[in-house]
Regions:
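Acidic/polar loop-and-plug regions of large Gram-negative outer-membrane beta-barrel proteins
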Residues: 1-53, 87-126, 172-203, 343-349
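Transmembrane beta-barrel wall of Gram-negative outer-membrane proteins
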Residues: 1-21, 47-54, 133-134, 142-148, ...
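Residue-level signature of outer-membrane beta-barrel architecture
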Residues: 2, 57-60, 134, 144-146, ...
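Repeated loop/turn-to-beta-strand initiation elements of outer-membrane beta-barrel proteins
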Residues: 6-10, 62-65, 150-151, 221-224, ...
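Membrane-embedded beta-barrel scaffold of Gram-negative outer-membrane proteins
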Residues: 55-59, 64-82, 274, 280-290, ...
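Signature of Gram-negative outer-membrane beta-barrel scaffolds
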Residues: 152-276, 303, 384-386, 391-393, ...
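Gram-negative outer-membrane beta-barrel transporters
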Residues: 217-224, 337-339, 359-451, 514-516
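C-terminal beta-signal and adjacent terminal beta-strands/loops
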Residues: 339, 382, 442-450, 469-517
Length: 517
């Protein structure tokens, strides 16, 4: 950070990170046992990214300005085992008995049919995914006025450009040559041997926006905020994907080019009033949208749509904020309603497609109440209580390909209707040194895994405890994460592997030491 002159300051930041993980967060407790899962191919994720940011802050007369630019690059590769797919279509699928669909492509069918022998290749399959993302954002805003002025204002421009080439390759080295290269009755593609499915896609997003906001003091206790954001976005998809083994040309998938443009004006409105006890009563309205996208589908077999459209959100919130004069109590409560127009969501239903896909499920509404209460007691306890009640549901039937998949009133996926938490902190002295302990408990209510054919995901409670001793230039912490060793069902996979559940970390007890140089 440096002062260029008395009116202009520059801040340059660079962050570089690389992480590598192996294994998976899912397990099969009912069939294999607690924290156990079955894999043939080792799984890993390799994630590397760099971000450079430049911020310029300065003054021009009575107004101030800020420029913020960010340049982001990310390369990711991960590999995951896909043998549950092979097993399902070899042995477990309805109508498959013994010599299954998947075996048909890895075994010599004629040896089995005429001689009763199994001349089979290794059926192991895995998915290899990679992306190389580049994103640049630029924002310039000017503001004027300070708290207490009749009018405070803000205007700005924004630009966002994203380029994201990504590739999914489902590798099946044991695929019989006649199916993968088309040499013997098959319909594969020469040079694509050993590949079951390949998706080579490029997505480009470009967004331009101008915005303005004014805070108008109606009187000494009431402020009115009005704002507008005009945006123009352009999304370009270049999608090439499809089966390369064992199917006709009609099933090779898509070479789809699509350009979608969106533009509009999103309003913002807020009014707040300070009450006699210095509490704040407020109302907010805001509007936003999410851009469209594309799915991985083949031309004929999947019910999943090739494209899904943008959606729009109108958010209404009314709330109350209170803090007493000595800061020992703070209380916030808010009620909100989120109206979604043609809501986007992810659907995983094997009756509709063999992979998860995104689609527009129609209008939806989420209403809720949330509160938090902070208390500092006379004997030094710092306590934070939080809770929320949510009603997330469809406002109309979800219809896909002329068939009702979920009726109006269905609970939205992966949204808990109840949540609660408590955090307690206490400072104390030990051996003449400052110390403190923290206790955190949270409760998450039950959820549904999908909008169609949902699996009930039970409620769970997580807790953690830590105690820290502070030295002059060091800290030592004893901690216990997941005190009760809870196995939360974060999400239950409805795929080919039975009852696969993604869970949290098991109980961990440890010591952390920090030394300040």
């Amino acid at each position: 950070r440096a002062w260029i002159n008395e009116n202009l300051m520059a801040t340059l930041t660079h962050i570089s990170q690389e992480s590598y993980t192996s294994g998976s967060w899912d397990h099969q407790p009912d069939t294999l046992g607690d924290l156990k899962t079955s894999r043939i191919k080792d799984e890993f994720t390799d994630d590397e990214w760099d971000q450079t940011s430049l911020t310029l802050e300065g003054n021009i007369g009575e107004s101030s300005f800020t420029y913020a630019g960010t340049f982001f690059d990310r390369d990711v590769r991960y590999l995951w085992d896909y043998n549950d797919y092979v097993e399902y279509y070899s042995l477990d699928a309805v109508g498959v008995n013994g010599f299954g669909y998947a075996s048909y492509y890895t075994c010599d069918y004629y040896s089995y049919y005429y001689y009763g022998t199994y001349d089979c290749n290794n059926p192991t399959m895995w998915a290899d995914y990679s992306l190389s993302m580049e994103r640049d954002t630029h924002e310039l805003r000017f503001s004027g006025g300070v708290e207490g002025d009749k009018v405070q204002w803000l205007i700005g421009v924004f630009y966002d450009k994203l380029e994201n080439p990504y590739q999914y390759t489902y590798k099946w080295p044991g695929l019989q040559d006649e199916w993968s290269n088309g040499s013997f009755g098959g319909t594969g593609i020469a040079g694509r041997e050993g590949i079951w499915w390949d998706a080579d896609n490029l997505r480009k997003d470009e967004t331009k926006a101008v915005y303005g906001e004014a805070i108008i003091s109606l009187n000494e206790n009431t402020d009115l905020t009005v704002g507008l954001r005009a945006f123009d976005s352009k999304l370009t998809f270049d999608a090439k994907d499809g089966y390369f083994g064992g199917y006709g040309i009609d099933y090779y998938g898509h070479e789809a080019n699509r350009t979608e443009k969106d533009s509009g004006i999103s309003p913002k409105l807020a009014i707040s009033r300070t009450l006699e006890n210095d509490a704040l009563l407020y109302f907010n309205f805001s509007q936003g949208y999410r851009p469209a996208g594309t799915n991985r589908t083949n031309k004929n077999s999947d019910s999943a749509p090739l494209y899904y459209d943008s959606d729009e959100l109108n958010n209404y919130e009314v709330g109350y904020k209170y803090s007493n004069s000595d800061g020992t109590q703070r209380f916030n409560i808010a009620g909100y309603m989120m109206d979604w127009k043609d809501m986007q969501t992810a659907v995983y239903d094997r009756d509709l497609a063999t992979i998860q896909f995104n689609t527009n499920i129609g209008d939806a509404r989420i209403t809720g109440v949330e509160l938090d209460w902070t208390i500092i007691t006379d004997n030094g306890f710092f306590i934070v209580l939080g809770a929320s009640l949510i009603d997330p549901k469809l406002e109309e039937d979800f219809v896909l390909n002329g068939v009702v998949q979920a009726t109006s009133g269905t609970q939205l996926a992966n949204v808990a209707k109840q949540k609660a938490s408590i955090a307690i902190n206490k400072e104390f002295s030990f051996a003449g040194r400052n110390a403190y302990w923290d206790l955190n408990l949270s409760r998450t209510g039950k959820r549904e895994s999908s909008i169609t054919n949902p699996v009930n995901q039970p409620a769970y409670t997580l807790g953690s405890f830590s105690s820290t001793l502070e030295g002059e230039n060091w800290d030592g912490t004893l901690y216990i994460d997941n005190i009760s060793d809870e196995r939360a069902v974060i999400w239950e996979y409805q795929g080919f592997r039975p009852e696969t559940k993604f869970t949290n970390r098991p109980r961990e007890i440890g010591i952390r030491l920090k030394y300040k140089l």
